Amino acid sequence: VAKALLEFEADKLRLYPDPAALELREAIAAAVSIPEHPVAADQVFVGVGSDDVLALAFLTFFNSKKPILFPDITYSFYDVWADLYGIPYRTPGLDERFRLKKADYLTENGGIIFPNPNAPTGLMENLDTIEEIVAKNPDSVVIVDEAYVDFGGVSALPLVDKYENLLIVQTFSKSRALAGMRIGFAIGQKKLISYLNDVKFSFNSYTMNRLTIA
């Protein structure tokens, strides 16, 4: 980061940044790819921090009259966005071990979101649980908020190839210690990412500045 800032050509600040942030998306795709599960740049969506990405995801995917589902103990902004966008929601309780009760997420819904690890509890759901929730909700987008995944646990990124309704959201603010750069990103299949871009570009094409992209 320091090297990129030192080498940045200040004269470029007179120009608008790339609205698609292609170089940044290519770099993120390369960073999260593994040989068994490569990620392409067009599977990456970037925003000004993960809150920006999550808010756009709520606006894009949670537009049914059916309630969305998220745990009662969870990231505190989920209900804020739901209320802001007029999205009905239900908040199933956690079990006695403070983990998701899988059966609660296999009911009719307009979408699902949960943090993994859960921000307040620090507990991680295993991939089998996540996959079952995603697989049994083929008509709903399931968002896994992995803001803290690097502090312990396994990412659900390997499931993206298999499920077109799965969106993974991560951030540069926590384990990468770059909160001041305001970079959040989502990984999903190309079609899902294209829907996010359609909404984003409809009202704000330039969400990231040139220094951040550098």
Go through each PLM region and give its residues.
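PLP-dependent aminotransferase class I/II
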Residues: 19-20, 165-214
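Short glycine-rich anion-binding loops that position phosphate/pyrophosphate groups of nucleotides
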Residues: 1, 50-51, 75, 116-120, ...
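PLP-dependent aminotransferase-like
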Residues: 60-115
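N-terminal small-domain helix-loop-helix segment of the aminotransferase-like
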Residues: 1-49, 56
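Catalytic-core regions built around general acid/base machinery
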Residues: 129-137, 158-162, 195, 199
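Short acidic capping loops at alpha-helix termini that bridge into adjacent secondary structure
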Residues: 37-44, 65-67, 146, 164-165
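Active-site phosphate-binding strand-loop segment of PLP-dependent enzymes
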Residues: 95-150
